[in-house]
Amino acid sequence: MTTRRNLLIGAASVAVLGAARVRAEPILTDDGLYKEPWFLESFLELADDLEAARKDCKRFVIMWELKGCPYCKETHFVNFARGDISDYIKANFEVLQLNTIGARKVTDFDGVELSEKELAAKYGVRFTPTFQFFPERAAPLKALPPQQREVARAPGYLRPDDFLAMFRYVREKAYESKSFREFVKSLPS
């Protein structure tokens, strides 16, 4: 029997379900990597990608992954699954996904074209996932050695709260005055 109480409970349930965000699942690509639907689609010209991100008032980051990497998968299914994390990243960053053993050709900031695998070696990327964060302008990077081009790096998996903190660290330019560890310690508990 339909009572007023059951009707109200049903209406409230529908409202809650309707308000719940539906998260788009990561897609398993042909190269065996999971990809978020909001990742940057790119011609793999890093200077152009960085400048395009800057024009959109965003920062540019490269996510390095490897097929079969359990922590890469966890980054997608745990870290990116949190709405506060994915919303913050989408609003403030352009994320380019690269494969540490990939064969696609990428044009580095210095104009040199390399395979993804060669680019990973050039930058000393050894762990997956690794996130490389770059400054706001591409032009000065051309003259710098590869490892001096990034403003921050997250080598390996970070738990969700630390992961979000790393993106905040870069967005807030805290790297100009303190280490990531100092930044995390300064955050409210």
Task: Label each residue range with its predicted role.
Residues 25-39:
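N-proximal helix/coil linker or "cap" segments that precede and/or mark the start of modular domains
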Residues 135-175:
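Non-catalytic, surface beta->alpha helical segment in thiol-disulfide oxidoreductase systems
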